[in-house]
Every structure is written in structure tokens, then in C-alpha cells.
Amino acid sequence: MKDEQLYYFEKSPVFKAMMHFSLPMMIGTLLSVIYGILNIYFIGFLEDSHMISAISLTLPVFAILMGLGNLFDVGAGTYISRLLGAKDYSKSKFVSSFSIYGGIALGLIVILVALPFSDQIAAILGARGETLALTSNYLKVMFLSAPFVILFFILEQFARAIGAPMISMIGMLASVSLNIILDPILIFGFDLNVVGAALGTAISNVAAALFFIIYFMKNSDVVSVNIKLAKPNKEMLSEIFKIGIPAFLMSILMGFTGLVLNLFLAHYGNFAIASYGISFRLVQFPELIIMGLCEGVVPLIAYNFMSNKGRMKDVIKAVIMSIGVIFVVCMIAVFTIGHHMVGLFTTDQAIVEMATFILKVTMTSLLLNGIGFLFTGMLQATGQGRGATIMAILQGVVIIPVLFIMNALFGLTGVMWSLLIAESLCALAAMLIVYLLRDRLTVDTSELIEG
């Protein structure tokens, strides 16, 4: 490993190390928001609601592809960081090689299984009439690019795992920039419409994956793309998938709960959907910053779990303090200028009032959400597969019974408060799990919970 990477893992001041790993990830998560709206933005110029609907309907499929990537990227990434902390550099080559080619194989399976049924999958997603063919065509490009999409997720995670978060950010930035260039050319220049939007995203993922491959081939002695090293054993599979499977479940279940929430909101009409949509966009930015902070330090926690548990404890404390500062700043902003923030999106006073209320509720849950992110990342980093699995399931399903109960008791207001209640339950569960596993973590995590 390079001396600079070792410096941030082992010797730099804790806050400096935290920012080194987290800042690129924060920027990367914000870029993912831009990435998600680019296609709809450009397609919007065509003023065809069917095309916009087609792209929106494919979001669950992208979430599934991301979840499939998580099988390898989160599990193998945290395992590699732990191996580096234990100075076992040779084993990390075998882990990375297996994960890279395992991810490619998974993508090829997606092509074989899903591509022939693109029309049927589009119908299951809700596409009807003119939207059906458009959605199916978009899906076909997505499925064909699946190996590269999954590979992109894996390699981006590996860059952070070995202590090169700036490379991770550069790869994501290059992908988004290329997408911005390609979308108008393919959509308008070649008159490909929805297919052009899909191709722009696919080509961007291919280019980013190639960027990471070239980087690792030239600069890394701990990540290998040599297929001859892709030889898994029982220990390797256990270490990868005991964390990868919970990460996969979390992605799938979170998408499912989002669908359930939408169904409850739809019961109250466009007024409720619009109000929640505005508040969601506003709270998404601090939430993604906190998510980037928590996910960014996962390699740092994993590395020091094997080499310096006192430093690991200091990193966790620094992250908790940072989450607290972000939370306080956001709460002050929401309770002082929340109306004006919502007013940037609509002039309908009824929606402004409801969206402002929802914004206050969802922002109140930001602190608990952050604790949940951090402790889930901590369980992943330290290889606590059972705890990570429990958290993945809880974060995906707890909100569902809460939604039913609160909706029955308090209507739309209850639906909104259910978000805070569910986050509170998940945060308490995360703290309890970490407390129960404190001996395995071999650091006094009870201090972190008790203050």
C-alpha cells in the first residue's frame, strides 16, 4: 500500500482521517442524486409524459442492480479493509479478483434471465399502453449493461476500501459528466429518445468501470483483476456474503418500503404525494451528507478494527459528533425558514403548509437516521454478519406495521409521524445490537451508547 493511504488509516488526526474518507463519499452521494435526475431532465424537453413515466418506472430495477452489486462490493470491500488492517495484502488480491469476476458473472445472469422478459417485467412495474414499449426498451439497455453497472459499484467500493476515496469520487464524477455530455447527443442528436437516455447511462457506467480497472492495474498492489486469482474458499465466501447478503436485503427491502409508503400517500391524493415529494427532496440533501459520512468511514473502521481499536472508537465518536452538528444546523434552518424553503417548489399554500409540517417531522428523524446509518456501517465494517442482517431486515420492515397503525389512528398526519417512530425503533435496535456485541467488537461501545 502507498504511504499516504497508510497515513490516513493509521496516523493522521482522527477528524482529518474522517474527512479524507468521508468528504469524497458525501460528494459522491450528492452526485448520485444528480445522476438520478439527469435522464428525466433531458427527456423532459421532449414534453412526453409517457417517456418520463417509463424512466421513473425503471427505478426499482436499478435498485435491484445496486443490491446485486452490494452482494460483493460491501461484503468484499469491508473484508479487504480488515485484511489490510491485519497486513494480509496477498489475501486481498484473491478476494478482489473473485468479487470482480463474481460481479461480472452475476451481471451476465441478469442478461440471460431478465432480457428475454423485458416486456413482462415492464408490465409488472406498472407500464401500460404507450408507456409499455418505452419502458421495455429502456429495460433492455439496462439489462445489457448489468455486468458493467454491477462492476462499477464493486470497483468504486474497492477504491474506498484501500484508502483511495478521491479515486472513488473521480470515477463517479467522470461517470456523471460523461452522462451529461452523452444524454443530449443521443436523445436529441440521434433522436433515440428513451433508448438514448438509457444508452447514455450505460456507456457512462462502462467508462467508469474501465477507469477503475485501469487505475487498479497500474496503481494497486492489493486489488487484482487477474482472473487466475478468482479462487474462492469457504472462509472467503463466508466473510464476503455474511455482510454482502444483509446489504443486498437492505437495498431490496428499502425499495419495497418506499413502494408501500407511496401506496399510503396515494390514498390521500396528489396533495399528499406532492407535499411529501417536496419535503423528501429537501431532507434528502442532509440525509445523503450523513449517509456519505457514515459510509465513508466504514473502511477506516474496518481497518482499525484489526489494527488499532482505540482509534476505531475515536473515529466513531467523531462521526457521532459530526452527525449532531449537522442535525442541529438543519433543525434551526427548518424551524426558522422552512416555509420559504418549501415555497421554492410551489405557491400552493395548502401544499406549503403540509410540506412544511412533513419537513419538520422528517428532519427531526435525521439524527436517529444518522445513528442507524453509523451503527449499521459499524456492524458491516467489523464483520458482524448476524447483527448486520437483523438491522437490514428491521430497517426494511419496521415501518410497515407502524404505517398501518398510525394511518388507522391519525390518518395522513399519522403516516408522516410513522417515519419518525420507525427511525426511532431502528436506532434503538442498532444501539442494542452494538451493545450486545460489545465483546466481539472488543472495544467499550457501551460508552458510545451511554454518552
UniProtKB/Swiss-Prot annotation:
Q: Which domain of life is it from?
A: Bacteria
Coiled-coil boundaries:
none
**InterPro entries from the entry?**
MATE_fam, MATE_MepA-like, MATE_MepA_subfamily, MdtK-like
**In the UniProt record, does the keyword Cytoplasm occur?**
no
Question: Which Pfam families does the entry link to?
Answer: MatE
Function of the protein? Multidrug resistance efflux protein.
Protein name (database record): Multidrug export protein MepA
Organism expressing this protein natively: Staphylococcus aureus (strain bovine RF122 / ET3-1)
